Amino acid sequence: MKNPSSSSVKSRFTRRFLRALIKINRQKPSSSSSREIFLRYRRIRIAADKAMACVIGSRRAWSRAVLRRIKNQKRKRLADSLRRSNGIHGMKKMVAKEEDEISYEQENELRKLVPGVGAMDLCSMLDETAHYVMCLATQVQVMRKIVDFYST
Amino acid sequence: MLHRLYSPERWTFNGTDVSALQRQHAGLKRLQQQNYIVQNNSVEFGSNPLSGFRGLVSSSFHVVGAEGFVPSEAAMEQCSSWTSGCMTAEMETVKLKEINLALTPERDNSNKRKAEIAADERCIEKRSKGEVGMEYSEVKAKCSSTEISANTSSKENSKVSEVEKSKYIHVRPPRGQATGSHSLAERARREKINRKMKCLQELVPGCSKVTGKAGMLDEIINYVQCLQRQVEFLSMTLAALNPSQEFNVANFPAKEFPAYITKFPAAAKLPALANRACLPFFPTQPGATNCMPDVALHSPQASIERNSTYSVSTSQQTLNSSGISQLGPLSSWSLDSQGLYDEYNTGFQ
């Protein structure tokens, strides 16, 4: 497996994300209401997702799924984001699990979390999950540094 | 020779066409691969011309005398004794083939059957050794009862055993084999999953202590959720920070930004200190910020923010040091708008 948390992926993601941030910041907010902040948040979130998926490219299923979802989201953006956040919060219920075997509930839960692994077998899904986790960790690291930098 | 050809048919000709096929197959293969057997057979055959030819070839290197007995094909091949010997062997095989053709009415289907037999042999290899061994010994006993000559008995044995095995697999339903391959595939899949889980275990912190796949998957799910929420939260924070950010982003080109990020603690100290120094003047200085030329766009909204979050600004000194992550979006907004001005000031002073 290629190591996605290498410095090249990190720096490329940083560059892309910052470019997107600059682009978002060009459009000045008309008001400072929470609605405005929410819209801005959504755009930044999509920009972060898109930057990461673009850096990874089309060689991974999850990045392909993210890009496709962003493309499809142009129209029904708000409803989808609401549904997704509801879905994540609704998945909090714990499942009764055996000791050593992976239950279907867990598998489905992971399938919902990782984009683009809906119809995969378990092996490929775990592979995708590993890659996705690494990329998410990189993303969080970079974004936290940006936030820290700007918040001081 | 003819006796040998007949002998397998005699004992396996019990209604199955496989025996005829087997006999023909074995005979052809043996004769084509082992020329010396054919030569020996020719001596036994009693065909005196061929044996005389062999004697001539071996003794006098010239094949002149052989031309009287051998047909024109061998006459054209006069270069060496070895090639002519081969030719005689080939001729012998051709003869035997004709005999075979005459003896086997099912020869048209021989190719198809051969393919079937090959497939069956491949299937048989996967079966358990005990059954095969038993079958093989049985076939051996059968073969010893028949009059198969000594120099070809081993080869005949293997052929017969294969044919018997193919018969056997036709009789028996391949139940054991199916489950065997399924269980093999299942085991391979499980090993693959275990490898992937181990890989994931290294990625997810705190997952190495958990035993069992279910617990590990729980940890992984939690970690992915946590990371996704962190991304959400961080983008929310960035959204809250954003109105003030364009100066910074414009000041720091994207290409140089990673360098700033990597030495963030050193770079952040100066603005933080300046921020704290400017803080006491903050509530009483709306006019001071308004008079700055470039911040004119942001001043109305900043003042609005100040009105709405005035209570927050009183406790800003502590919040400033504790960092953004403990603040809500609105408080960080006001904090940042103030911090931006300070940073802007320090950047141009």
Residue ranges and their predicted role:
Chain A
Residues 1-127, 131-152:
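Intrinsically disordered regulatory regions flanking bHLH/HLH domains
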